A protein has these predicted regions:
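An acidic, Gly/Ser/Thr/Pro-rich helix-cap/linker signature
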Residues: 64-81, 85-86
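Secretory-pathway/luminal and periplasmic proteins that interact with or process carbohydrate-rich
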Residues: 55-60, 75-76, 147-158
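Sec-dependent bacterial lipoprotein signal peptides
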Residues: 1-20
Length: 205
């Protein structure tokens, strides 16, 4: 699958998420990021926002549940081979087709957008001592690892080619692009995030 333009996507995603930082006034209906994390409820709301983003049709609301991933796995019976539909093109693994490529770009962008939201929560935990924060940190680390894992399996070589370049593993909210890590490095970071998350969530029970 053709590599996604990482630098451009990262800039667009992070600019969108950080837009409120460039405003000196509060806009009705928009919550300033600094104010969002002033209290425990703000963290809960932000966490719920991450889960809502994961439920989007570009992620687990469709494409990564029963949509694109099932189509490229050819789990659907293709009874319309004579018709040029997006489904048949995806079924045939025509990744560069003008109808298929937007699906791929949307998955990539939405996944990193959601990772950025999770990282925003994680970056703002420091300096607060709300009782719920260990559980929130554990959940957001899990989300970050989970999304990177799905991006890795879709857009990178398998672990047998562990030294090859894979995807960026993004660990902080930033508008700066992140260089790609190797397949092995991404797996190591996934395991590290999940290991910490397991301890936090176990102790939060």
């Amino acid at each position: 699958m053709e590599r996604i333009p990482i630098r451009i996507t990262a800039l667009l995603v992070m600019t969108t998420l950080a837009a409120c930082d460039f405003l000196d006034i509060d806009t009705p209906g928009i919550v300033n990021r600094d104010k969002m994390f002033e209290n425990e409820q703000g963290f809960i709301d932000a966490m719920n926002g991450v889960y809502a983003s994961m439920a989007d049709a570009d992620l687990y609301g469709e494409q990564l549940s029963f949509g694109f991933v099932d189509e490229i796995a050819q789990l659907y019976y293709n009874d319309y081979e004579a018709n040029e539909t997006t489904l048949t093109k995806t079924f045939d693994l025509r990744y560069r087709d003008e109808d298929v490529r937007p699906q791929i770009d949307a998955i990539w962008s939405k996944a990193y957008n959601t990772i950025a939201s999770a990282n925003s929560v994680l970056d703002n935990i420091s300096g607060h001592d709300f009782a719920i924060l260990p559980r929130i940190r554990g959940e957001e680390l899990t989300v970050r690892a989970f999304l990177h894992f799905d991006l890795l399996r879709l857009f990178a070589p398998n672990i047998e080619r562990g030294d090859e370049q894979a995807i960026p593993y993004v660990e902080h909210f930033s508008i700066s692009p992140v260089e790609r890590s190797t397949v092995r490095e991404v797996y190591e970071r996934i395991v590290a995030d999940l290991t910490e998350a397991y301890g936090l969530l176990r102790d939060a029970q």
